[in-house]
């Protein structure tokens, strides 16, 4: 920790560079914004508020490409979370966040506090969190370090979420070498509220109180936002102090107190915001900026759990379980009493002021006096260079890779043991998916489904991201990411409403990485417009590199859908013997980036085939109509491993089997053409189903009594015992996790 250097020493020693500011930014702050040298505390404030994590200075120009409005959207990007109207004066609130860098350094706390932070975003909007999801990407399970990271991250997510009493109902876990040194830990939370309870993160009304509530402030997490905006080095031990430590029991109390305040005492409250990245400085500045007001804080009043904390440390701390409130003058004691009933501190630390200045007092001195806008609105945005990676240019000229297989059965057996495809039960069982007793469908299905109490409705939710596809073709891969999420939602019988995202990429200063970001957002934005799923919230996590090696560009899409009648929820597993099986969508030679390509070649190469998104959207809409009419018994989307893996998964955990005859060669059984599903339909509903779906379906077989997978292809056929396939699928990951390296 640097001692309190003078402004001149900061300039001379270039300390600001260590804190993440560039030379150009520092000079701009001195010469254009302040007309003087910033002091130690002010330099710290600029360094975190101008970090990519807080300012989006690199990504903002391309994030503007996303659609973020339609008739259902009540709150888009810019607040703690997005909000969508679901009828009956209710709304769903959701958001996703990344905690990648902290989880690589201190995986348990990194993952746990990622969950805690996203939950605070939800209840800061006035909503009660009803479900959590995650999207986790690790290196291959072939070394002790990766196994340690996996176990600790899963334990951290489960430990925090279970203590909070919020079910973890869905998610994904994938494995690729590129994530070995920089795992991705993306957390998503979903909440429900009455529309009359919606809150804003704003501090307006001259003389109104700024109140600090929750846990005391310590030295944990200082410069966490800067840490999240930089590349990794080998020596991660030195970065542990930037990782926060969570207390879920404190957060549970904080959540209940905040919900009581927002639901029952709105007349006391002006605004509320989570203290997340960059702690007090970020929450207070953002609340002032949104209200176009000033703020004056006395840092001596901030509850502190460590002695001798400087203004710099107090402002930059990312201690968990804290919120900032703007309370109407005269109601300070009311709020104090409410939080005391939950054994929580609530302290007035400042006031909303006239004008636009941000003033901080500490130990009798003014340690900061700058315009709010310099921290929030005047960030120096520089256009980024873009360059098409050579691998993309090379791939354009290559022939489509089509594998040569000797045995469909042996290939299926091998694919079911690929870690990305294999059962994740040993991890998901760590999570409580049934707490609150509203879970209709939990982990292991296409989407998690939560009943909305007091109504017939339910919400379906999913997280999906495939970095391999974006790596091979960012624009097409971006479209596939959104479509995969929508397919999962529709497969559950739900209408897709909107998305949140976590955009996990490498160093944006690399022109090739920035090109990947830009092109993939183009693809995602096109898909969002076509599917009418606006982006209502999200998160950008850049600098995901380890010693100069970037991860695959990985866009995680979190999507929520509405089921009008919970009794029309469609399961992912076959239900009735004799039901007809249909393949929805057409199958092509889509093997590049697939699990099959990785299995056979141990690497992914080539380009992706583009596809007709309008056509896919048209038949997905028709499929949803059939589901809402109760014509579909079960449905499962086709993703990793293609049709072969999906057919097997549909009978796992059941006592039934499947018999199909396919007009395709064995290789196509494992193609990963996007936008496809397998559905089962009872014989009574076949005529109505076929009339609605028309030419977009192919009858392929039926559900049978025998507990077997019986597949006939044009050049191969096999019968496999479901119990044997399921054993391979279930034991693959436990076996890898136990193996000696």
Curated annotation (Swiss-Prot):
It comes from the Bacteria. GO terms for biological process: 'de novo' IMP biosynthetic process. GO terms for molecular function: ATP binding; magnesium ion binding; phosphoribosylformylglycinamidine synthase activity. InterPro entries: PRibForGlyAmidine_synth_PurL, PurL_linker, PurM-like_C_dom, PurM-like_C_sf, PurM-like_N, PurM-like_N_sf. The keyword Lipid biosynthesis does not apply. Its EC number is 6.3.5.3. The active site is at residues 53, 99. It is found in: Cytoplasm. Gene3D superfamilies: PurM-like C-terminal domain, PurM-like, N-terminal domain. CDD domains: PurL_repeat1, PurL_repeat2. Pfam families: AIRS, AIRS_C, FGAR-AT_linker. Pathway: Purine metabolism; IMP biosynthesis via de novo pathway; 5-amino-1-(5-phospho-D-ribosyl)imidazole from N(2)-formyl-N(1)-(5-phospho-D-ribosyl)glycinamide: step 1/2. It catalyses: N(2)-formyl-N(1)-(5-phospho-beta-D-ribosyl)glycinamide + L-glutamine + ATP + H2O = 2-formamido-N(1)-(5-O-phospho-beta-D-ribosyl)acetamidine + L-glutamate + ADP + phosphate + H(+). HAMAP family: PurL_2. This is Phosphoribosylformylglycinamidine synthase subunit PurL. It comes from Ligilactobacillus salivarius (strain UCC118). The gene is purL.
